[in-house]
Amino acid sequence: MAPSALLRPFWKLLAPARFPSVSSSRSKFYIQEPPHGSPNWLKVGLTLGTSVFLWIYLIKQHNEDVLEYKRRNGLE
């Protein structure tokens, strides 16, 4: 086999990348624009509720860890 035939696939790796046009790539992923006038209140509520729950749990766990640290090291 000729050396040029072996190197031919590697030249494709060295070629500059070609990006698809913006309009063709958008049409693949966005069928329609989401409605911005009416937010999905269920998702908003679940997101905020989860965030509040996690912060409360984090603070509670931190306080328990601080008390355990003080107890083990005789600082209390």
UniProtKB/Swiss-Prot annotation:
UniProt keyword GTP-binding present: no
Protein's UniProt keywords contain GTP-binding:
no
Q: Which InterPro entries match?
A: NDUFC1
Q: How does it sit in the membrane?
A: Single-pass membrane protein
Starting at the broadest rank, the lineage of the source organism is: Eukaryota, Metazoa, Chordata, Craniata, Vertebrata
The entry's localization annotation reads: Mitochondrion inner membrane
Q: Where is the transit peptide?
A: 1-27
Q: What protein family is recorded?
A: Belongs to the complex I NDUFC1 subunit family.
Q: Out of the domains of life, which is the source?
A: Eukaryota
Protein name in UniProt: NADH dehydrogenase [ubiquinone] 1 subunit C1, mitochondrial
Q: How does it assemble?
A: Complex I is composed of 45 different subunits.
Q: Which UniProt keywords apply?
A: Electron transport, Membrane, Mitochondrion, Mitochondrion inner membrane, Respiratory chain, Transit peptide, Transmembrane, Transmembrane helix, Transport
Q: State the GO CC annotations.
A: mitochondrial inner membrane; mitochondrion; respiratory chain complex I
Job of this protein: Accessory subunit of the mitochondrial membrane respiratory chain NADH dehydrogenase (Complex I), that is believed not to be involved in catalysis. Complex I functions in the transfer of electrons from NADH to the respiratory chain. The immediate electron acceptor for the enzyme is believed to be ubiquinone.
Q: Which organism is it from?
A: Bos taurus (Bovine)
Which gene underlies this protein? NDUFC1
Tell me, what's a Pfam family for it? NADH_dh_m_C1
Q: Where are the transmembrane segments?
A: 41-59
